[in-house]
């Protein structure tokens, strides 16, 4: 919710994966942003079809949510996949928000968008102690 409040204004647009975590859309609606769903499909290894997304008018899109390892599909993204998504964000001046709480428990070597220096200005990554340290329900800070 706080990311939406910090980066969005009424009428801005947000790219939200389908299937995906419902809170991405809910938090965006709080600030009266418009939700644009992009489909994840097994034919594309549950990755965003960037060419399809790019065929739309993206001038009002401010945030694109991604989540890898993905829930609910369990799909994983490679560093190369994440680099393509980050490049897409930079090209269109879209903040890529990578909800990444499962990386530390589902990957042999956790992958981070922040490893790709060229795109750091257009990415934000979230992690969670509840997944990696079995702290579900704990509140810190």
Regions found by a protein language model. Name each.
Residues 12, 33, 91-95, 119-121:
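A short helix->loop->beta-strand "cap" motif at the edges of active sites that frequently abuts
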Residues 6, 26-28, 88:
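Hydrophobic/aromatic ligand-binding patch that stacks against planar heteroaromatic rings
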Residues 116-141:
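Active-site PLP attachment segment
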Residues 1-13:
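Phosphate-binding glycine-rich loop
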Residues 2, 24, 85, 113:
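Aromatic/hydrophobic pocket-lining residues that form π-stacking "cages" and hydrophobic walls in ligand
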Residues 21, 68-72, 131:
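Short glycine-rich anion-binding loops that position phosphate/pyrophosphate groups of nucleotides
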Residues 36, 40-111:
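Active-site phosphate-binding strand-loop segment of PLP-dependent enzymes
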